[in-house]
Design a protein with these regions (language model features):
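PP2C/PPM-type serine/threonine phosphatase catalytic domain
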Residues: 5-323, 334-336, 345, 356, ...
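Cyclic nucleotide-binding regulatory domains
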Residues: 324-380, 391
Length: 418
């Protein structure tokens, strides 16, 4: 039966070795760990590990008088129950049978509905129990299907993708400072010590649930963690070093030990999922479609490079989709970002329109910031988002690839076409 993780003890570990999941092409190995820390009287984090549904999730509750742990538990229980329902199974089965863009959008819509159901359940609990007023929770969960990972996110817990060449922060904290930067609002250069949440499950009348997906390969590692873990990590380079040591259990224990050594100021929880050998082979193997690869190969940053080099560069990228009228942020997950346009169209502030194979914010990849208004998606638009630090990390691992990328980037910026 599906198992959620009892986070009541000081430290707990759940490990499964080389599991086969439904609808997923790879074997996995995973570990989950939680620690109350050295300051908090109780643990308000909750973890969901449900390999029978290819579902993993993490929640960090908030609210006094034990209400935070209630909120986190409600969220985790609701996610599990919603993904268990036949309509969810039908959507995931349809995606695995034919993983086209429309089927992918159906999965995204499902994940948003699941997050919204958790939100509604917490609001209902608050309505019926006065002591629960003010409770809420962060929520991150991932569903593994076909050869991909689908993520849903609300709050400031995080999802990371750790690859041999880079560690990618997939989610953006829904906190005030990060949200203002993403919107292009002038903000201090340094993140303030107080950075309140502006979006989480149960926090307000409505919730916004971010969704994204990544193609997976053997050797990839997925990390879900609460802020008690990521606040204790000095940098993504430091996180990469932690994640390079041993298997999932070693990584989970190492991260919690480090959080305690840094003061144990908060509850700390983590799930580590390793992507192992692939036992299902499909015609539509992992990676960009032939059409998307052709579009990307025509982008100024990647033009003239071999398919292998293009895929190497894309290890730093995450595909995102924006609706018509959405502004395209230049700051995501505490870093400058650039975008490669897969399809759709983007209107720039100067009146120009960028279409497939276009490049947005190329200066971000060398740490420069362009002033002015943000571009806007003119239609539903798919893009590959690349954070500056992730791009630099990929380049550090492959000098030949780095030379090719920076040469193209310098030429593009010198021509003033960015």
């Amino acid at each position: 039966a599906p198992r959620d993780f009892d986070a009541a003890r000081t430290v707990s570990i759940l490990v499964a070795v080389s599991r086969i999941l439904p609808r997923f092409d790879y074997r996995i190995e995973f570990a989950a760990s939680t620690d109350v820390g050295l300051v908090r009287p109780s643990n308000e984090d909750r973890i969901l590990c449900c390999p029978e549904l290819a579902l993993f999730g993490i929640a960090d509750g908030m609210g006094g008088h034990a209400a935070g742990e209630v909120a986190a538990q409600i969220a985790i229980d609701t996610v599990r129950d919603e993904v268990l329902r036949p309509p969810a199974a039908a959507i995931l089965d349809a995606y695995v049978a034919d993983p086209n863009i429309e089927a992918r959008r159906e999965v995204f819509a499902l994940l948003r509905r699941v997050g919204e159901a958790a939100h509604a359940a917490i609001l209902e609990a608050r309505r019926t129990e006065p002591s629960y007023q003010g409770m809420g929770t962060t929520l991150d969960f991932v569903v593994l299907a076909h050869s991909r990972a689908f993520f849903a996110h609300a709050g400031d817990s995080r999802a990371y993708l750790v690859r041999p060449t880079t560690t990618v922060q997939l989610t953006q904290d829904h906190a005030l400072y990060d949200t203002l930067r993403a919107a292009g609002t002038p903000t201090p250069a340094r993140k303030p010590q107080r950075n309140p949440l502006v979006n989480a499950i149960g926090l307000a009348g409505t919730v916004s649930v971010d969704t994204l997906f990544v193609d997976l390969s053997r050797g990839d590692r997925i990390l879900l963690c609460t802020d008690g873990v990521h606040n204790a990590i000095e940098s993504e380079a430091s996180l990469s070093r932690f994640c390079a040591k041993g298997g999932p259990q070693d990584v989970a224990e190492g991260l919690l030990k480090h959080a305690r050594e840094r003061g144990g100021l908060d509850n700390a929880s983590v799930i580590v999922i390793d992507i192992m050998d692939r036992f299902v082979k499909r015609a539509d193997d992992a990676g960009p479609s032939s059409r998307d690869l052709s579009v990307l190969s025509a982008c100024p940053l990647l033009a003239g490079m071999s398919p292998a080099a293009v895929l190497g560069a894309l290890a730093a990228g995450v595909e995102v989709e924006l609706g018509a009228g959405d502004r395209i942020p230049r700051d995501v997950a505490s870093d400058l970002v650039a975008y490669l346009v897969l399809d759709g169209a983007v209107d720039l502030p100067d009146g120009r329109r960028i279409i497939s194979s276009g490049l947005l914010f190329p200066e971000s990849l060398v740490g420069a910031r362009r002033k002015g208004d943000l571009p806007v998606a003119a239609a539903r638009t798919r893009l590959i988002r690349i954070r500056k630090d992730d791009f630099a990390e990929v380049c550090e691992h492959d000098a030949e690839l780095a030379a090719a990328l920076y040469q193209r980037l310098a030429r593009y910026l010198a021509l003033g076409t960015g």
